[in-house]
Amino acid sequence: MTPTTVVSAAALDAEPGLDAFGNDPWWIILIKALAVFVFLMLCVLMMIMADRKVMGRMQQRHGPNRFGPWGLLQSLADGVKLSLKEDLIPRTVDKVIYIAAPMIAAIPAFFAFSVIPVGPEVTMFGVETRLQLTDLPVAVLLVLATASLGVYGIVLAGWASRSPYPLLGGLRASAQVISYEIAMGLSFIAVFIYAGTLSTSGIVEAQQNIWFAVILFPSFVIYLITMIGETNRLPFDLPEGEGELVGGFMTEYSSMKFTMFFLAEYVNMVTVSAMSVTLFLGGYLAPPPITTFWPGANEGWWPALWWLIKFVCVMFLFVWVRGSLPRVRYDQLMKLGWKILIPIQLVWITAVAVIRVLNNQEYPGYVTAIVVGVFGLLVFLGLWAWSRAAAKAKAQEAAEHEAELRARRENPMYGGFPVPPMIAPHYGTSVLAEEPRYQPASAPKREEVSGA
């Protein structure tokens, strides 16, 4: 027995539902792998196109409408254009890391989608197989790990460019991913508590009766926020803020290397959207109103259609948020991640765990109600204390600001200026009246010497 067989047997013992994987013919696995790759590339092309068209409508303009019918081939044309551009490599870069960074950012993004279930078991070319490339007992952790690996490419791109703007963009990206991945992982924990498994197909099957987005709504909302921060999209696109860092970590890149960073960003968007459908929106299961009058809605290829509809709705959220919200400041980004999302998620997970234990132990309903009431009271007291502290800090900040304005009125040079203002005394046009202005002495007249 090989080590691989031993590991597979142990995985099947731990997760009985995984016995449907690993028994497909090699050509079925190859077809599914190619289908995943083609689907991701098509999603990237269509997402870029939808991004530009929807943004155009939200800004009361047409968007790209020249290349192809209704401009649908514009993304393909942009890709061809970028591939034909000159591939410039600055002289001072660390060449090996500079070239490897785009690949490090793009390749892990494709791996994560391999554990996303798109549908149940179907018949494909006469073979019974699931619409999922593979599954693992820790599939969700695999997605979380591969999503965080991409930031290494961003950080290395900033460092290898040997330029201040890319370096700052890389540092921002690493801090942002660390901050928001903690909150994202905490939102997964609530799902694990209710599903009892970390396998993606098992989590979908656990939502047969009710979606986790309903019973775990705070975790769902926090996940939606963190997935936007994880993919560096507006309003959290600080690593590539044009007004501050030109192009951020991509400033020194061109041609296909530049394209690979964009490819990684959009593939990550596809992955986190698919994960939100899997963890919170019932995956490929039909919405409950449909299953009440159509028992066969979750059979055959129909579940793939329900999954696709949910997936498109979540992807539209990225475009809608980008067109509606302005970019936040970096301190606001860090404050949201560390001071708001993580504390709320910790309190929520504690409440979910306690309620889950009480339900499993079959305690009376009034005990659960008392626990929920105590948690609600604690949350209310915490919010009240936080609001008082915030109001006090705001009043103190306003008082300090008023004192600074008063000091500036009394002394124009208060705080110092890189360039002195025009009212400073050493400008000739604004010298005080009582100070005598310097008058240069007149030059003596030359005496003409007459010849003898």
UniProtKB/Swiss-Prot annotation:
Pfam families: NADHdh. Its main location: membrane. One of its GO terms (biological process) is aerobic respiration. It is a multi-pass membrane protein. It catalyses: a quinone + NADH + 5 H(+)(in) = a quinol + NAD(+) + 4 H(+)(out). It is found in: Cell membrane. GO terms for molecular function: NADH dehydrogenase activity; oxidoreductase activity, acting on NAD(P)H, quinone or similar compound as acceptor; quinone binding. One of its GO terms (cellular component) is plasma membrane. Belongs to the complex I subunit 1 family. NDH-1 is composed of 14 different subunits. Subunits NuoA, H, J, K, L, M, N constitute the membrane sector of the complex. This is NADH-quinone oxidoreductase subunit H. It comes from Thermobifida fusca (strain YX).
